């Protein structure tokens, strides 16, 4: 044993010996994280090998930088680089546990949101998490205890060259094998899981940095010709209004109710013999209500902000980060601006602070007249949970604010209580939790019931006030509530194994539209959040033909029932496409690649590509539809000057006095 320690000390006291030891530790730790934390969809032997192999080139290249330092400083720099890479890996692990996604450079600009997460972050931490820094600790101990005794020499340049040649060679082999299994990996991939699976988490960070820089320069290089190409494409996908529904809600108020993290399976679901959402179940059966039961969320990293962006603009969120934080000052042709020029007053009600998701900036670009944020509400400790005000006091305190608005109005109420990790006071829980053993899944049903009761109270007010009879009410789920990291618990809830296909089907969220005097019913056509704006505008009697919108009217006979996901997958009534595999949507059985699938994929890729071009290039500055006046963000100010909330005043055009 003593001889082994002496030999180890001699090896580790050599720059290359210590370097190789650190490389092996980082390599194995990263691979362990891949197989235990990430669901990357490994499907063949090449992918299994690459998952094991891909951390090696990153470890060699990045840790190799430390060899440029002399003597003991090389060891110190190696430890620092190892620590930074460990922090990056662990940050991705924690982020993935909730979002099932990886951190990108644009998401770092959303870091001001993290301070409001409250208990959500702690629910994502595990007792074994310190192990992600075990290799760093080992390296520090070896140096601090002088177990290693570095010689004060500088490594020869030719040896340094060999290290980097080896790293580049390893990466080249990695990339070559990846391209053989997934051709054009770096040029036609919308899914970050692909890059991590084939090239690794560290190389993904470099790739993402390049993509982010490319996107930031796209605006400077854009011109009106880009917009012409986009409009030519959209003219071929436009769905004309259905005369049966066009203008049925003309002149009516619009009330959006944002159902936070609400998945469609909750509707009509019974837990222990009790309906989880009795009010919403009954509301979907109202004689004037259209309930879309094949409606999917299409959010990416922006989650709630992506959902809002799609509903207000009928354009997709970004492949990395959030439009709200990264493109807030673009030119938009949003719903509040379109309707504002028809005499509507627009407002958002939200029990969180206005800076969350950069709403106080992006709403100005959308043309919202007013934004009632947390500063208008009583944010006492009893009524605040997680991200902000609980839903029942939120709706109660929103009523006097709503009463200040001139009609017709376009409004949105953003709820918060039904948010991960779904905490709820025992006194407010009116249904027992599920019993899967997964606390987030179990309490999800209790917070969903609380949301259901909150919405009922608000609808009761609308009926009593008379607003119910002259307002279009739109309820929508913004994104999933339970990610695929909880598949074991969800298998118990759904009574079947939650594989990739079943998880894709679970991305359904409710879309419920009630128009007074219009015949309702269950609508089975497939659609997504991108389709809501053209559907609503047509109900209000505004044709969308001249607007730049990537969705289409769900009620139009010409609506194409292919629902793109942000990562390039899609679902349709016949086919569900997931990462190069295809399934019969009705049965879940694998199907062969067909011409129909090829056409669908081309349409999905074009829609995502052109939408990204419009957003990244800020192309709407080059095109103004006839009759539309571009928004002037400087006109809007959301500062709460009047703390007496029942006395908030608005001018005739809905702006703050």
PLM region spans:
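Transmembrane and membrane-interface helices of multi-pass
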Residues: 2-209
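Intrinsic-disorder-associated interaction segments
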Residues: 5, 13, 17, 219-223, ...
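Membrane-interface junctions
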Residues: 14, 71, 120-127, 223, ...
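Generic alpha-helical secondary structure signal
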Residues: 47, 72, 105-108, 112-115, ...
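General structural signal for secondary-structure boundaries
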Residues: 99-107, 122-129, 221, 304, ...
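Conserved acidic functional residues
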Residues: 133, 197-217, 261, 470, ...
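Membrane-interface segments at or immediately adjacent to transmembrane helices
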Residues: 174-251
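Solvent-exposed soluble domains appended to multi-pass membrane proteins
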Residues: 234-657
């Amino acid at each position: 044993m003593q001889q082994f320690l002496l030999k180890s000390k001699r090896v580790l006291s050599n720059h290359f010996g210590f370097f190789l030891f650190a490389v092996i530790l980082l390599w194995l730790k990263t691979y362990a994280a891949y197989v235990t934390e990430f669901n990357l969809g490994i499907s063949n032997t090449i992918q299994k090998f690459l998952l094991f192999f891909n951390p090696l080139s990153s470890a060699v290249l990045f840790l190799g930088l430390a060899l440029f330092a002399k003597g003991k400083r090389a060891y110190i720099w190696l430890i620092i680089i190892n620590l930074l890479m460990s922090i990056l890996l662990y940050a991705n692990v924690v982020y993935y546990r909730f979002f099932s996604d990886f951190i990108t450079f644009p998401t770092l600009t959303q870091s001001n949101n993290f301070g409001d997460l409250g208990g959500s972050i702690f629910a994502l931490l595990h007792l074994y998490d310190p192990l992600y820094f075990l290799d760093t600790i080992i390296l520090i101990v070896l140096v601090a205890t002088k177990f290693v005794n570095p010689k004060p020499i500088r490594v020869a340049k030719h040896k340094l060259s060999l290290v980097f040649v080896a790293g580049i060679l390893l990466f080249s082999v990695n990339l070559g094998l990846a391209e053989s299994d997934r051709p054009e990996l770096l040029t036609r991939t919308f899914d970050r899981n692909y890059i991590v699976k084939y090239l690794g988490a560290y190389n993904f960070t470099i790739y993402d940095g390049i993509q982010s820089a490319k996107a930031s320069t796209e605006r400077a290089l854009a011109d009106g010709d880009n917009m012409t190409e986009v409009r030519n494409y959209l003219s071929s996908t436009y769905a004309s209004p259905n005369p049966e529904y066009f203008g049925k809600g003309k002149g009516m108020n619009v009330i959006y109710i944002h159902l936070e993290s609400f998945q469609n399976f909750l509707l009509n679901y019974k837990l222990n013999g009790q309906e989880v959402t009795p009010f919403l179940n009954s509301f979907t059966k109202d004689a004037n209500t259209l309930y879309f039961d094949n409606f999917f969320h299409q959010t990416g990293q922006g989650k709630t902000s992506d959902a809002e962006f799609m509903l207000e603009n009928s354009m997709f969120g970004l492949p990395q980060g959030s439009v709200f934080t990264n493109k807030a000052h673009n030119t938009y042709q949003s719903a509040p601006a379109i309707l504002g020029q028809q005499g509507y007053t627009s407002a958002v009600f939200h029990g969180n602070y206005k800076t969350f998701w950069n709403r106080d900036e992006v709403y100005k670009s959308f043309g919202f007249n007013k934004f009632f944020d947390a500063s208008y509400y009583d944010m006492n400790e009893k009524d605040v949970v997680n991200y902000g005000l609980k839903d029942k006091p939120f709706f109660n305190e929103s009523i006097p604010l709503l009463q200040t608005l001139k009609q017709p109005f376009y409004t949105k109420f953003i709820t918060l209580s039904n948010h991960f990790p779904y905490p709820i006071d025992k006194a407010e829980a009116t249904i027992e939790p599920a019993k899967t053993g997964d606390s987030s899944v179990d309490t999800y049903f209790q917070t969903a019931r609380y949301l259901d009761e909150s919405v009922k109270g608000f609808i009761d007010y609308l009926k009593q006030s008379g607003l119910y009879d002259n307002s279009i009410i739109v309820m929508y789920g913004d994104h999933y509530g339970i990610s695929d990291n909880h598949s074991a618990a969800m298998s118990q809830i759904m009574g079947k194994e939650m594989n990739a296909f079943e998880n894709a089907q679970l991305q359904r969220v409710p879309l419920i539209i009630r128009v007074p005097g219009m015949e309702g019913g269950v609508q089975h056509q497939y659609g997504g959040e991108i389709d809501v704006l053209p559907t609503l505008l047509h109900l209000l009697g505004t044709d969308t033909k001249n607007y730049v919108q990537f969705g289409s009217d769900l009620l139009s006979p010409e609506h194409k029932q292919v629902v793109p996901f942000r990562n390039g997958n899609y679902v349709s009534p016949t086919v569900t496409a997931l990462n190069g595999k295809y399934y019969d949507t009705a049965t879940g059985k694998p199907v062969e690649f067909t011409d129909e699938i090829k056409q669908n994929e081309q349409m999905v890729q074009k829609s995502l590509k052109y939408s990204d071009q419009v957003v990244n290039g800020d192309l709407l500055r080059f095109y103004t539809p006839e009759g539309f006046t571009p928004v002037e963000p400087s006109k809007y100010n959301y500062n709460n000057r009047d703390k007496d909330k029942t006395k908030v005043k608005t001018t005739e055009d809905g702006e703050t006095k």
